[in-house]
Amino acid sequence: QFFMEEAFFDDCGSYVNNQPIDYHIQAIEDTEIIYFYLDDLKAIAEKSSVIERIGIKIAADFLNNHREHVTILMKFSPEERYKYLLTNKPELVQRISVTHLAQFLDISRETLSRMRARLAEQNIL
């Protein structure tokens, strides 16, 4: 997944299970990272219902984005996936390298390049 400015990232499973995440996070642009220790975060949430609600909202947003990505991969052809991003997340298409975009769409870089060329010829881009 990709996260833009002022976005929060979390791993609900690691939070709930009190275990480290089992993948890595890579910043592809200059990034400022603020992290919280789990015990500190739980203590703050217990003292503030506002913080607790913010945490729930962050988790819900993350789960919705993940669900959307999985649904797109399962339901759409590679071209439909790319068109979906063009329509619904144009900032990703504009800012992310072809290599990262292809990985996100679960297609090869070459396939994405050919698809983009074909769509450009059809004036769809």
What residue spans do the PLM features occupy?
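Residues that recognize and position ribonucleotide moieties
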Residues: 1, 26, 34, 56, ...
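Nucleotide phosphate-binding site architecture
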Residues: 9, 34, 42
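A conserved hydrophobic position in a structured secondary element of the catalytic/binding core
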Residues: 3-4, 28, 36-37, 46
